A protein has these predicted regions:
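C-terminal binding/interaction regions
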Residues: 1-26, 63, 68-110
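Conserved mixed alpha/beta catalytic, RNA-binding, or beta-rich assembly cores of soluble enzyme
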Residues: 15-68
């Protein structure tokens, strides 16, 4: 299992992996992010039979961060998700893509 060299990046990968296990109705995806003050936010995906009531892990983590006042981000970690939703809020921010076992498969800047 590879891990990010930066301990703070490793922390958000771990947070995303842990959040993924709390997904509903089943583990699907987890996300975590770190804002420019060092605060971290994590969320799991939440499914529902009505797609309008479902949310992705990334949306949940971003909603928690933005509703707490965060507007700038240092890094994102995604487990079983894609970085498409990051385009607006994360320009120039590193994204750590990880498999469910925590293997970081890509590091990119959106």
């Amino acid at each position: 299992v590879s891990a990010p060299a930066d301990p703070e990046d490793a922390k958000i990968v771990t947070l995303a992996r842990t959040a993924r296990t709390r997904g509903y109705p089943a583990p699907d995806e987890g996300a975590a992010l770190r804002d420019d003050t060092g605060r971290t936010y994590a969320a799991a995906s939440v499914g529902h039979r009505d797609p309008a009531l479902a949310t992705s892990a990334l949306r949940g983590a971003l909603a928690a961060a933005v509703s707490s006042g965060a507007r700038r981000f240092e890094a994102f970690a995604l487990v079983a998700a894609t970085p498409a939703l990051l385009a607006e809020l994360a320009v120039g921010t590193p994204v750590l893509l990880a498999t469910p076992d925590g293997t970081v498969v890509a590091t990119d800047v959106v």
